[in-house]
């Protein structure tokens, strides 16, 4: 095999392995001792496993996490804040596209969608039911993804977007989205365990 480069292991937060390349027990042990997450994904980008070292302490954190998971009111608080962040960030992407590329994007459509997302924010803030929150999140995501194709400004023929699909993703854009969500899920899992 050709060496592409070298990076000191202690400078990494994580290593992501694709297409079953494997990792030696020595590498896995060193990653575990340094707290470097080692994640494995299939050739299609599906999450397979994470190799982590011994969890040290954090009993109080774990107890708090279980308590929150058992309480619908507290779970709702966290879910609401995550969803508010997602919708706020979706609006930011749309507004930035209209500001930075007014000649290349359908400004009116993006502004209209941004306004719809803005109108959803107070509904999300006031919602105290997890199922209703999921519904509001789904509606916001649908609105965002309805105009997502117009945000793709480079290599549009290769990365056009007709709608969200997963398990399996049916096109290049959905494959990239699923891959990014897999990486995000791996990072979130690592954060919850630390």
Predicted regions and their residues:
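N- or domain-start disorder-to-order transition segments that initiate the globular core
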Residues: 1-8
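Active-site helix-to-loop segments that bind/position phosphate- or nucleotide-bearing substrates
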Residues: 6, 60-194
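A surface-exposed, charged beta-strand/loop segment in the N-terminal or early-internal portion
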Residues: 11, 19-92
């Amino acid at each position: 095999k050709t060496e592409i480069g070298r990076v000191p292991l202690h400078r990494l937060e994580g290593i992501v392995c694709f297409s079953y390349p494997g990792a030696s027990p020595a590498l896995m042990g060193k990653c575990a001792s340094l707290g470097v997450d080692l994640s494995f994904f299939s050739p299609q980008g599906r999450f397979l496993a994470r190799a982590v070292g011994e969890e040290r302490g954090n009993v109080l954190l774990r107890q708090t996490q279980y308590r929150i998971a058992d309480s619908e009111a507290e779970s709702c608080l966290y879910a609401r804040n995550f969803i508010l962040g997602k919708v706020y960030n979706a609006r930011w992407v749309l507004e930035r596209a209209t500001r930075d590329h007014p000649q290349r994007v359908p400004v009116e459509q993006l502004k209209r969608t941004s306004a719809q997302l803005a109108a959803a924010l107070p509904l999300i803030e006031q919602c105290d039911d997890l199922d209703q929150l999921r519904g509001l999140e789904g509606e916001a995501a649908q609105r965002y993804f309805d105009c997502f194709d117009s945000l793709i400004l480079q290599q549009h023929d290769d990365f056009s977007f007709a709608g969200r699909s997963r398990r399996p993703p049916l096109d290049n854009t959905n494959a990239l989205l699923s891959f990014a969500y897999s990486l995000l899920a791996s990072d979130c899992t690592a954060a919850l365990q630390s």
